[in-house]
Amino acid sequence: MNPARRVFVHGFPGLYGGAGTELHHQILAWLAMGIEVHLIPNNPGYEQEPLYPEMLSRGVAVHRCNGWEVLEPGDPVLAFCSAEFLACLPEIRRHTRRTVFLNCMTWLFETERRCMANGEIAMFLYQNETVRLNHMRELRRLNDDPAIRFLTFKPYFDPERFTFHSRRETEFFGCGRISRQDADKYSRNTLHIYEYFVAPKFKRAVFLGYDHRAEAKIGRPYDWIRTARDQNEFSQQEFYKHCEIVLQPTDTTENWPRVGFEAMASGSVLIVDNRGGWQQMVDHGRTGWLCNHERDFIYYASKMAYEPNLRADMAEAAKRRAIELGGLDASKSSWEEVFDEIAKLPE
């Protein structure tokens, strides 16, 4: 078998959180392409993962935790934003030199820098061209070997798991924000923004991905804001069904936020920071709103609350935008190019 027609991944897909969710959707694209998919978990509890039954039913081969003995020369091994993968590279490269690292962040891991200097990563993959150029510039200073490749791909997003809500008949105006539990995912003025935007109905918000770290940063949410630690307390589907808008000021610069696709597929209009991957994902004024200041967040949230017809039009446009950016055909074509390049890497 051509080694590029099968792929090994270090890690396990998930239903919540950036890298795990990203991996899940890409596995679906690879299977649709006829790629043979193998998972080498990095956690011994992988059999308890929610997606374990689905992976087996789809024909994905799941090996033992860190079971590198299954690798043959020429097998590509990918990892999505995994520090554990970087730490294992010396051992992995005793079996295959086709090591591929996908950094989901806008910054570099220190271990990633070291691995680049040592020539342990054969290919770097990115979802965002701007991030690729920035990272490549920094990494090339550490190792100018032209055989090390830097590519972008078009990530697949599976919209079937999210229901599009064209109309929400409730007595309140639903809003919220969603992320993993990380204080940096919250802007310090989050509560100020939620308090001061106005709506013709009572506001009700959900903060999904909230714990003591967020509270230490932004303060205790108002009584009309429900908080949930993760999807086990409040699922993504429940969240988007609730939210007319996703009002999400953060202190981070996002790379290619999966929650953007989820919101667009669900009919929740995005009101987000005017930086990072949001600038490529959101068509300002047509599919969502890009904000430079807390006043922008307050204004656009109020506008969406008082103009339901405009909000509905933007939600429909955003749904089409999600298909344009993350559709299966475009993603498959992109991944074909990536696998063709992987097949050219030294074995």
Ranges and model annotations:
Residues 284-295, 303-308:
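Conserved acidic donor-binding segment of nucleotide-sugar-dependent glycosyltransferases
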Residues 107-148:
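A short, active-site helix/loop in glycosyltransferases that binds the activated sugar's phosphate group
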Residues 244, 267:
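A short alpha->beta transition loop at the rim of the catalytic pocket in nucleotide-sugar-dependent
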